[in-house]
């Protein structure tokens, strides 16, 4: 499973159209369709009813919250990494002493 497949899945859930989801994702409709088909193959079944409207199947409904959480966590990880690499990360306090410890 790849992140772009998850993003396309979520876009298709929102748009309910392969053409609109592809446009929203910045890819061609055949690329989005191929990615969704590969995801369906990996998960073992159809995620969407394609006719008359694009709607989630039972399997699609079952995996939706998990794929959505993966996307949310990936975004949080990206934000945390950017914060650290741009100097906005967690701070560490370091204490030193000018006195030496006596003999043990």
In which residue ranges do the predicted regions lie?
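N-terminal winged-helix
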Residues: 29-30, 79, 85-104
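Alpha-helical linker/hinge and terminal dimerization helices associated
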Residues: 42-43, 63-85
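Glycine-rich ATP/GTP-binding catalytic cores of kinases/NTPases
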Residues: 19, 53-56, 84-90
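Nucleotide phosphate-binding site architecture
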Residues: 19, 48-49, 101
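N-terminal short secondary-structure element
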Residues: 1-31, 35, 63-68
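Short amphipathic alpha-helical coupling segments at ligand-binding clamshell hinges
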Residues: 59-66, 104
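Residue cluster at the C-terminal edge of the helix-turn-helix DNA-binding motif
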Residues: 15, 24, 37-46, 78
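A short LG(V/I)-centered, amphipathic sequence patch enriched
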Residues: 40-58
